[in-house]
Amino acid sequence: MATQTVEGSSRSGPRRTLTGDLLKPLNSEYGKVAPGWGTTPFMGVAMALFAIFLSIILEIYNSSVLLDGISTS
């Protein structure tokens, strides 16, 4: 037999901690899906703005052709 139970063991289940008690409400919504699109449009806008930001940083770093008409000093 792979597992063995000991009768009369004093194991009472999972141990409660302060951190666990603080984080428990955050996990109570696990698996629930909001109806409709939810915050998807906001996430799309955030991703687009981040992509624009990254392309600007890359263009500045590479001294890209797109920035030839813009003086940086």
Curated annotation (Swiss-Prot):
Phosphothreonine modification sites are: T3, T5
Instruction: Give one Pfam family, short name only.
Output: PsbH
Annotated spans, Disordered: 1-20
What does the UniProt record tell us about how this protein is modified after translation?
A: Phosphorylation is a light-dependent reaction catalyzed by a membrane-bound kinase; phosphorylation occurs on Thr residue(s) in the N-terminus of the protein.
Q: Quote the Gene3D superfamilies the UniProt record gives.
A: Photosystem II reaction center protein H
One GO MF term attached to the UniProt entry: phosphate ion binding
Which ranges does the record mark as transmembrane?
41-61
Q: Which keywords accompany this UniProt record?
A: Chloroplast, Membrane, Phosphoprotein, Photosynthesis, Photosystem II, Plastid, Thylakoid, Transmembrane, Transmembrane helix
User: Does the UniProt entry include the keyword S-adenosyl-L-methionine?
Assistant: no
Report the function annotation for this chain: One of the components of the core complex of photosystem II (PSII), required for its stability and/or assembly. PSII is a light-driven water:plastoquinone oxidoreductase that uses light energy to abstract electrons from H(2)O, generating O(2) and a proton gradient subsequently used for ATP formation. It consists of a core antenna complex that captures photons, and an electron transfer chain that converts photonic excitation into a charge separation.
Self-association or partners: how does it assemble?
PSII is composed of 1 copy each of membrane proteins PsbA, PsbB, PsbC, PsbD, PsbE, PsbF, PsbH, PsbI, PsbJ, PsbK, PsbL, PsbM, PsbT, PsbX, PsbY, PsbZ, Psb30/Ycf12, at least 3 peripheral proteins of the oxygen-evolving complex and a large number of cofactors. It forms dimeric complexes.
Identify its protein family.
Belongs to the PsbH family.
Its recorded name reads Photosystem II reaction center protein H
At the highest ranks, the source species' classification is:
Eukaryota, Viridiplantae, Streptophyta, Embryophyta, Tracheophyta
Its gene?
Answer: psbH
